[in-house]
Amino acid sequence: MVTDIQARNARVPDGKTGAFPTLRTIQPADVEACGRAAYEAHRTVAAAHNYPPEHPSVEFSIGLIGNKLKDPNAWGILAEYDGRILGSVFLNLFPSTPVAVIGPLTVDPAAEGGVGRRLMQAALDEARQRGIGQVRLVQSPSHLRSLALYVKLGFEVREPLLLVHGAPPATAAIEGCVVRRATPEDALACERLCVTVHGFARAFELRSAIEQKTATVVERAGRISGYATAIGLRGYAVTEATDDLKALIAGAPAILGPGFFVPIRNGALLRWLLDNGFRSLWPAMLMTAGAYHEPSGAFLPSIAF
């Protein structure tokens, strides 16, 4: 773990001011300032490319940082100089998986000279010290500087994604597929399916979604062939085949949040969504550092991975 003492020794110059920001752990008193910095960073990028903002308001950004700080499975640090916060990053842990996820990473647009790189390197070092061999993130291609940074740090592009928005097409039910709410008794079958598709189970997220009653399963011939923790940015789905994904989307109680990510390489699914009234919002890329298991079935990633 990066301590404040280590952080003070890990200084990087700011390209515009010549200042030397330091890194330290995020404290409750930092939440509002970190949230405002995150909002401005995302607003600037979205406005430059005419994309809908990922952070729709300052209050949203402050709430996001506050929730991350309260999460026992999240670790966050910030960069500051002379009391001004220049950026922050979180490393998100997923119990029962070999994966950690970096994000959100935000850097003040006025801060240059390696602030983002130092924050990213600290997060990667933290993952390494925790024995985590797979680190992932979802990157917006509109931000070319961050893409170059991630590549330099060893990340590989694994899946081009498209955020889509729409309503569940209830009239497009898939023949032979039955969608229902997931129950605790379904968990083991779902976990085995996730291992088949991704190489590991995401049991913590799955069981939390079942408790919150957002998880659904799809059955064919009385056998579970896929599941979703939710259809939305915060949920993910794992299935044997694309038709199972279509069924989960068509049978979803609602689309949670602004939409969900679709792997662009799954052309059959993307065409089906567009034919059923979904519209594209913005592109993104799933990137990974370390080991990676190429999915063997069909899936929808969350905003994390």
What are these regions (language model features)?
Residues V2-L64, R158-L161, A170-A201:
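Short amphipathic alpha-helix that is part of the acyltransferase structural core
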Residues L147-T171:
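Short, structured interface segments
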Residues M1-P21, P28, L69-K70, A74-G76, ...:
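Intrinsically disordered, low-complexity, positively biased terminal segments
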Residues G15, R24-A127, G131-I132:
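Active-site-proximal cofactor/substrate-binding loop regions of enzyme domains
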